[in-house]
Design a protein with these regions (language model features):
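Active-site-proximal beta-strand elements of phosphoester/diester hydrolases
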Residues: 1-10, 96-106, 130-133, 187-193, ...
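N-terminal active-site segment of His-dependent metallophosphoesterases
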Residues: 1-59, 140-143
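Residue-level marker of motif borders
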Residues: 2, 38, 67-68, 91, ...
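Divalent metal-coordination and catalytic microenvironments
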Residues: 7, 38, 43, 56, ...
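Active-site environment of divalent metal-dependent phosphoester hydrolases
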Residues: 11-13, 45-51, 73-80, 107-110, ...
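Binuclear metal-dependent phosphoesterase catalytic core
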Residues: 22, 161, 180-235
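His/acidic metal-ligating clusters that form di-metal
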Residues: 26-37, 111-188, 217-220, 228
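Extended active-site neighborhood of metal-dependent phosphoesterases/phosphodiesterases
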Residues: 49-121, 154-157, 163-167, 185, ...
């Protein structure tokens, strides 16, 4: 079982963000049975300050299982790698699942891209796989969100790649601060709600990303009968 947290946006002096992540960590740490690992799918820090990552590490410390991270558009990749002492792209086992992370960030931009050529050789292990990236490779119907997403050409290239890798059972993402379900080339795409603020559904083009009072949450991904089942857990 893989637990997924996303988008805590920890900022120095922001007690509410720290408390929200602390609550999420406590909930995951108390799960029985315990997850095999935890994924934090981007925007760990709000400004990319190295001191924010030190705080994130402290807040994640109560988790007794391995914690895996990947960068979001608010993160500084070099600072994140230094804080967690590992590259942001890696392949690792999480119980019966294989977790493959992809860095979709573009320095200085909020949108993303998928480095398909770099990803292709990393998918050769036939173990049931979850592909994790910050930006979700789907169209949400919310114009302000879609403006900060993945280009269609990149999504098409990824779909072509996944057609040759049927062991990729799920794509999981963050970035959107809402739980959503879609698909890319027949592979289900799941977006995790934020551990902090949630974004409102604004289907009309406003140019803004308003928040709302929806509860934060996390996700659990389980391999059952050869397929991945994902659960949304509100906090």
């Amino acid at each position: 079982m893989l637990a997924q947290l996303s988008d805590p946006h920890i900022r120095l002096g922001d007690r509410a963000a720290a408390d929200a992540l602390r609550t999420a960590v406590a909930a995951v740490a108390a799960l029985d049975p315990a997850p095999d690992a935890v994924l934090v799918s981007g925007d760990l820090a709000d400004t990319g300050d190295p001191r924010e990552y030190a705080l994130v590490r402290d807040l994640l410390q109560p988790l007794p299982m391995p914690v895996h991270v990947l960068p979001g558009n608010h993160d500084d990749v070099a600072a994140l790698e230094a804080a967690f002492d590992r590259p942001v792209e890696y392949e690792v086992d999480a119980g019966p699942l294989r977790l493959v992370t992809v860095d979709t960030t573009i320095p200085g931009e909020d949108g993303g891209r998928i480095p398909v050529d770099r990803l292709a050789p990393r998918l050769n292990d036939p173990k049931p796989t979850i592909l994790a990236m910050h930006h979700a490779p789907l169209t949400t119907g919310v114009p302000a969100m879609d403006a900060l997403g993945i280009p269609l050409a990149d999504r098409a290239a990824l779909a072509d790649l996944l057609a040759h890798h049927p062991h990729v059972k799920r794509i999981v993402s963050g970035h959107l601060h809402r739980a959503m379900v879609g698909a890319l080339g027949g592979v289900p795409v799941f977006t995790c709600p934020g551990a902090n603020l949630q974004l409102a559904l604004a289907f009309r083009a406003t140019g803004e990303l308003p928040t709302n009072d929806d509860p934060p949450g996390y996700a659990l991904h389980l391999l059952l009968d050869g397929e991945v089942t994902s659960h949304l857990v509100p906090l």
